[in-house]
């Protein structure tokens, strides 16, 4: 057990400004919530060491600026991501409509080798707001979108009330680890970027 | 608009006065968005506006005018595509590459050579990195020095080259109310005409360079891009912001000298002139200032500048 290597999982949180990306990250990692987060400019990350299914994992969770204008710079941090968490506010229909853009942009910028099987996750946040009376996006609608994008797992969360936050991130970890295993099975000699690059180069030459 | 997501810095944004302070912020930022639809509202503008509330604790009009003046300097930072931010990040890399090759090389090796970690510092003019009480000392010192350097060189300060865009976009707006019209006119007066073909005095980039060099040892001890990002997001507050600007000015002049030597003493498109540096040293008469702008792009440059300099004078 103790000789097992600790895996590093890079998680990117994306979504419109004000949907609660920073709050979700802080609730998960530091178990605290405050309404007073400053708007994120650029990017920041927190790490958390966990153990899932007997595997030791260091989660590196990246929180990026949500305003569209900053998107092109935030993408500098997408590289090497193991999974991507798309967040919207269930009380804000536009933030849900924008999920398509965030997903597409991530795929373009991060360039995962197998985009169709890349582990995404969708979180509908702020379910606590006004006791649910201001909701604009139903669970059914959100789940339908997730199903149409290749069965993306969906969780309804409240960073404020700490509802489903731990469960969602545990699920993210499992999916990322499973994806890692499948990648290993798929191309056993090409698990790091350099090997892949060399192979590609070789293929180009011959 | 998320005016409420402003830090609790300053008396007017704390405790019982916070709701009123946030209302004022919202009014001023809304008025600005109406005046300048190309920029509109962007996150970070609250950070720039908040200190002005304290300078003009009761007068929204004056605070608005001052904010327009401030935006005049940094407006390009907020325009779509972030082309000007990329240019500034590229210049920052070029400046550090020239003035502290070891530090620059280290940052490149660990994957932080794009300097995106300094994005917040540049965008918000170090507003979040310095103590609240120091914000205005820093900004005013920086603006004064920038004006002096610009006057000495005959080149425009960082603000120039944006008037046309404001004038164009404002024509497409619905008719303004009398008060808005007055504000708009005052804003227009703050906008200098664009100077085609000139280069700018980007002292703010050198202030950020000075701040980074002040933390050289810590940056050299960062072993990864991630560590640099975390360090930058919890940047140690500079203790003396005037000294920081002094240092920035010295870096600016030194960078200019090195660029001039590298380019064999001639730089096309730059103006001639002499100046006296902050520590009273008389500089050589032959285009000492002009050379300092070698990393800056022409004002009419197109977006899409690469992160490693990008113009004809860029580091190879």
UniProtKB/Swiss-Prot annotation, chain A:
> Does the record carry Membrane as a key word?
yes
Asked if Transport is a keyword of the record, the answer is: yes
Q: Where does GTP bind?
A: 15-22, 63-67, 125-128
- Keyword annotations: Cell membrane, GTP-binding, Lipoprotein, Membrane, Nucleotide-binding, Prenylation, Protein transport, Transport
PROSITE patterns associated with the record: RAB (PS51419)
GO terms for biological process, alphabetical = protein transport
Report the coiled-coil segments. none
* Top-level taxon of the source organism: Eukaryota
Predominant localisation class: membrane
List the molecular function annotations (GO) for this entry: GTP binding; GTPase activity
Q: Where is the lipid attached (S-geranylgeranyl cysteine)?
A: 205-206
Compartment(s) of residence: Cell membrane
Among InterPro entries, the record links this protein to: P-loop_NTPase (IPR027417), Small_GTP-bd (IPR005225), Small_GTPase (IPR001806)
Q: How does it sit in the membrane?
A: Lipid-anchor
Short motif Effector region, span = 37-45
Query: What Gene Ontology cellular-component terms does the record carry?
Result: plasma membrane
What NCBIfam families does this protein's entry cite?
A: small_GTP (TIGR00231)
The entry's function note states: Protein transport. Probably involved in vesicular traffic.
As for family, the record states: Belongs to the small GTPase superfamily. Rab family.
Q: What is this protein called?
A: GTP-binding protein YPTC5
């Amino acid at each position: 057990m103790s000789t097992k290597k600790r895996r590093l999982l890079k998680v990117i949180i994306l979504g419109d400004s004000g949907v609660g990306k920073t709050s979700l990250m802080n609730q998960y990692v530091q178990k605290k919530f405050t309404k007073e987060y400053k708007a994120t400019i650029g990017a920041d990350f927190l790490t958390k060491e966990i153990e899932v299914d007997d595997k030791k994992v260091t989660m590196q969770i990246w929180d990026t600026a949500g305003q569209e204008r900053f998107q092109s710079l935030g993408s500098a941090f997408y590289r090497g991501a193991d999974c991507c968490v798309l967040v919207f506010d269930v009380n804000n229909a536009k933030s849900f409509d924008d999920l398509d853009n965030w997903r597409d942009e991530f795929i373009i910028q991060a360039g995962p080798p197998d985009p169709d099987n890349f582990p995404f996750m969708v979180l509908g946040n702020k379910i606590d707001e006004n006791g649910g009376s201001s909701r604009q996006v139903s669970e059914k609608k959100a789940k339908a979108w997730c199903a149409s994008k290749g069965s993306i797992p969906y969780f309804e969360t409240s960073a404020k009330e700490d509802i489903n936050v731990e469960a969602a991130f545990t699920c993210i970890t499992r999916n990322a680890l499973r994806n890692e295993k499948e990648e290993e099975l798929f191309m056993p000699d090409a698990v790091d970027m350099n090997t892949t690059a060399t192979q590609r180069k070789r293929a180009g030459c011959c | 608009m998320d005016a409420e997501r402003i830090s609790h810095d300053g008396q007017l944004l704390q405790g019982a006065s916070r709701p009123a302070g946030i209302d004022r912020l919202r009014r001023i930022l809304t008025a600005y968005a109406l005046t300048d639809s190309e920029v509109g509202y962007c996150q970070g503008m609250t950070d720039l506006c908040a200190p002005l509330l304290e300078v003009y604790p009761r007068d929204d009009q004056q605070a608005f005018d001052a904010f327009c003046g401030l935006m005049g300097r940094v407006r390009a930072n907020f325009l779509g595509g972030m082309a000007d931010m990329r240019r500034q990040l590229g210049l920052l890399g070029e400046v550090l590459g020239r003035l502290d090759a070891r530090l620059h090389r280290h940052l490149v090796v660990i994957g932080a050579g794009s300097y995106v970690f300094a994005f917040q510092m540049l965008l918000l003019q170090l507003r979040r990195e310095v103590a609240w009480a120091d914000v205005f000392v820093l900004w005013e010192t920086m603006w004064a020095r920038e004006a002096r350097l610009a006057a000495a060189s005959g080149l425009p300060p960082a603000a120039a080259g944006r008037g046309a865009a404001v004038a164009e976009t404002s024509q497409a707006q619905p008719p303004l109310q009398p008060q808005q019209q007055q504000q708009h006119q005052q804003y227009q007066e703050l906008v200098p005409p664009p100077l085609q073909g000139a280069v700018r005095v980007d002292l703010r980039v050198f202030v950020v360079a000075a701040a980074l060099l002040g933390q050289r040892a810590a940056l050299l001890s960062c072993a990864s891009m991630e560590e640099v990002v975390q360090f930058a997001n919890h940047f140690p507050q500079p203790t003396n912001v005037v000294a920081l600007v002094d240092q920035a000015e010295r870096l600016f002049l030194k960078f200019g000298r090195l660029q001039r030597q590298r380019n064999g003493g001639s730089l096309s498109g730059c103006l001639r002139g002499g100046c006296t540096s902050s520590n009273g040293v008389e500089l050589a008469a032959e285009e000492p200032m002009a050379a300092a702008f070698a990393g800056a792009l022409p004002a009419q440059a197109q977006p899409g500048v690469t992160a490693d300099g990008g113009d004809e004078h860029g580091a190879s």
